[in-house]
Design a protein with these regions (language model features):
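Amphipathic, well-packed alpha-helical segments that form the structural scaffold of globular domains
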Residues: 34-42, 133, 347, 370-373
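Thiamine diphosphate
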Residues: 99-131, 141-146, 172-304, 330, ...
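Glycine-rich, histidine-containing beta strand-loop boundary motifs that form or position
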Residues: 56, 78-80, 153-154, 181-183, ...
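Short alpha-helical segments and helix-capping/turn motifs at coil-helix boundaries
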Residues: 44-47, 58-67, 131-137, 161-173, ...
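N-terminal amphipathic, basic-rich helices that act as targeting or association modules
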Residues: 2-91, 249-271, 279, 283-289
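Extended, hydrophobic alpha-helical segments in both membrane/secreted and soluble proteins
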Residues: 149, 153-166, 368, 380, ...
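Helix-enriched interaction subdomains in cytosolic or periplasmic regions
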Residues: 307-319, 453, 458-501
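Cofactor-binding active-site loop characterized by glycine-rich and histidine/acidic residues
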Residues: 51-173, 355-356, 369-370
Length: 678
């Protein structure tokens, strides 16, 4: 769509280049701008993919915040930053949406490099209130109390414990922070009612229960109106809880409470925000919204409200986008999915063993646990955005005789490492951790790449680590992990997997994917096993033969793999995780130890992986290629290593005989050995 077409379809939005432009609009124009923002976001996300439902629900909230507060002088923070698309639209980044979440384009989250209006690069939940506390304390200390700090919190963030730690300090320190609570009915109310200590104790007390039950029975005994009266009492009780409990909870923490108000009425929101802006301490404005507001398909999606939409450019035209909706979720990929393989596998083990329980942290759909929840609701636990609690709870279940399987995104494992290490690992609790979205994930950028799971997992002494090379391997690995009776980690990527590469692996054994002699061994870890095969084929065309092994289990390593690798002249490991401290480093150390034990000079070990830096968003294949982790890059690394080995072997010969010892096209000469260089 060209610039002129943008102006025709979005006449008001095309006039907004900064938040200052918003303050020139009247109430009617604000309503029309909200409608235009929704149409624009649906159109843009349909073209590129992205988070839809959360942004559609926060349109009026974001408009009102920018009309009342003066960003970037005032600080606007977005918890779970995928609800910041409207914020980006209103701060001069409309044209960037043509490349939303594309390599070199607009990030799907706040990004400090994009705009001074983005203070934090926030994409993990429950952190904004802590940022807000710190910024507000800094303004107070630096003599700038006139600068306001606003945190938009919602979309599940208040199920995370860190948010409550921040609330406690905000109230105690009387920090001047305005909390805008985006309550879309999918996260907030159940959490607060359970954490409102005084009323929870009251409702659970025997006297309260007996009195309430007697009143209900007495009303229901009244002829003609009894049943209706009893139902009315229950409804009234529920309504009163919703009205009273948030006020009691926040006020008890020393935080002023306003609301609830309509989160889709800009005028009402502006009035409330103006009052909140004048308050000298912490204040929460409770706004009721609807996730996916104004777009039929999102509102009709009861499970996720079109939370995350894949690109469907054929449907993204202005004539087909309306507030009632025209863009639907496109056809599912026919490629094999690791997540779907796990989903089936956990159902299978659950059917065979009633002790199996499945745990997730607010991700039942994306991790593939919805079928398990539907079949075994009594054995399914969603703890909300509380990964630390999930891990320690799983340890407790394992200690008491259950077989917990924790399905979690790889990137979120860093949020609960202490619990993995001390509560699961130290106790040897047989918890199986299934890390989805491992490796380079793509569009969501540095906060969502799963690059640390191997590093973290391998630092826990007794944790078994599995890396399936293809989806068909996931089921067998889950069975093997449950049979170990020790902690275990299975990590697998978001991207579709290859067709079967070889005969299925068994137990803790490796798989030989290609026989190419004993001199060169390529170890492709997880999804990079296929890449190693492709690299070997490229090398074979040049007369360089290499064997390819899929380790399958990184720890404990198969003794057969160690024996084969220790006897080679060159070993190359490739992984789509962090290079330093990852699987390659662990394997290299094990090869070194095995070589020393056998009193042989070990092979040259070349490790390939992701360097220690924050990897931006982009297509996974493109990112991996730039890191040298595609077949071409891996083959190039093999050639370079062979040249090094040839040089190291030739130098002594040249000194002794004045002649060089070369390498033929087929590989290294027998007897040539390289130094162990890792």
């Amino acid at each position: 769509m060209d610039e002129h077409a943008h102006d025709v379809v979005y006449p008001l939005l095309s006039m907004i280049t900064s938040p200052a432009d918003l303050r020139q609009l009247d109430a009617g124009q604000c309503a029309e701008l909200a409608a235009e923002c929704r149409r624009f976001v649906v159109d843009a996300v349909s073209r590129t993919g992205g988070h839809l439902g959360s942004n559609l629900g926060a349109v009026e909230l974001t408009i009102a915040m920018h009309r009342v507060f003066d960003s970037p002088r005032d600080v606007l923070l977005f918890d779970t930053g995928h609800q910041a698309y409207i914020h980006k639209l209103l701060t001069g980044r409309r044209e960037g949406f043509a490349q939303l979440r594309q390599e070199g384009g607009l990030s799907g989250y706040p990004n400090r490099a994009e705009s001074p209006h983005d203070w934090i690069e926030n994409s993990h939940a429950s952190t904004a209130l802590s940022y807000a506390h710190g910024v507000a304390k800094a303004f107070e200390r630096l003599g700038e109390p006139h600068r306001r700090v606003v945190a938009l919190v919602g979309d599940g963030a208040l199920t995370g414990g860190m948010a409550y730690e921040a609330l406690n300090n905000l109230g105690h320190d009387e920090a001047r922070v305005c909390i805008v609570l985006n309550d879309n009915g999918r996260s907030y109310a159940p959490t607060v009612s359970k954490l409102s200590e005084s009323l929870t104790q009251l409702r659970l007390s025997p006297s309260y229960g007996m009195i309430r039950a007697k009143v209900v029975r007495a009303l229901e005994d009244i002829p003609g109106v009894g049943q209706l009266a009893g139902q009315s009492l229950r409804s009234l009780t529920s309504a009163l809880r919703e009205l009273v409990e948030p006020h009691v909870f926040f006020e008890a923490l020393g935080i002023r409470y306003l609301g609830p108000i309509d989160g889709h009425d800009v005028a009402v929101l502006e009035d409330a925000l103006a009052k909140a802006a004048r308050y000298p301490g912490p204040i929460v404005l409770h706004a009721l919204t609807r996730k996916g507001k104004g777009y039929g398909p999102a509102e009709a999606d009861e499970v996720q409200c079109l939370h995350d939409l894949k690109a469907q450019p054929a449907l993204a035209t202005p004539s087909r986008v309306s507030d009632r909706g025209a863009v639907l979720v496109g056809p599912r990929s026919t490629d094999a999915s690791y997540t779907e393989a796990f989903s089936k596998a956990v159902l299978d083990v659950g059917a065979r063993d009633e002790r199996v329980v499945a745990i997730t942290a607010a991700m039942p759909g994306p991790t593939g646990l919805l079928p398990f929840e539907a079949r075994y609701p009594e054995r399914f636990i969603d703890v909300g955005i509380a990964e630390s609690h999930a891990m320690t709870s799983a340890a407790g279940m394992a200690m008491a005789g259950l077989r917990p399987v924790v399905a979690i995104y790889s990137t979120f494992l860093s949020r609960c490492f202490d619990q993995q290490n001390l509560d699961v690992g130290l106790h040897g609790a047989p918890v199986v951790i299934c890390a989805d979205r491992a490796g380079v994930t793509g569009d969501d950028g540095p906060s969502h790449h799963g690059l640390l799971d191997m590093v973290l997992g391998l630092s826990i002494p007794n944790l078994a680590v599995f890396a399936p090379a293809e989806p068909s391997e996931v089921g067998g690995m889950l069975v093997s992990a449950l049979e170990l009776r020790t902690p275990a980690l299975i990590r697998y990527p978001k991207t579709p997997g290859p067709a079967r590469l070889a005969a299925p692996g068994t137990g803790l054994h490796c798989r030989i994917l290609r026989e190419g002699g004993d001199e060169i061994v390529l170890l492709g870890i997880g999804k990079l096993a296929k890449t190693a095969l492709e690299a070997a084929e490229l090398l074979a065309r040049e007369g360089i033969e290499a064997s390819v092994i899929d380790p399958r289990v990184i720890r404990p390593l198969d003794p057969a793999l160690l024996g084969r690798a220790s006897g080679a002249q060159l070993v190359v490991t490739a992984e789509d995780g962090l290079l330093h401290g990852g699987a390659g480093a662990y394997i290299a150390a094990e090869i070194d130890a095995a070589s020393a034990a056998a009193s042989v000079r070990g092979p040259l070990v070349v490790r390939l992986g992701v360097p220690t830096r924050y990897v931006p968003h982009g297509k996974p294949d493109v990112i991996l290629a730039r890191l040298g982790l595609d077949a071409t890059g891996m083959a190039s690394s093999v050639r370079g290593a062979l040249a090094r080995l040839q040089g190291s072997a030739a130098e002594p010969a040249m000194r002794a005989a004045g002649a060089g010892a070369g390498r033929g096209a087929g590989g290294l000469k027998n007897g040539q050995r390289g130094r162990v260089a890792r």
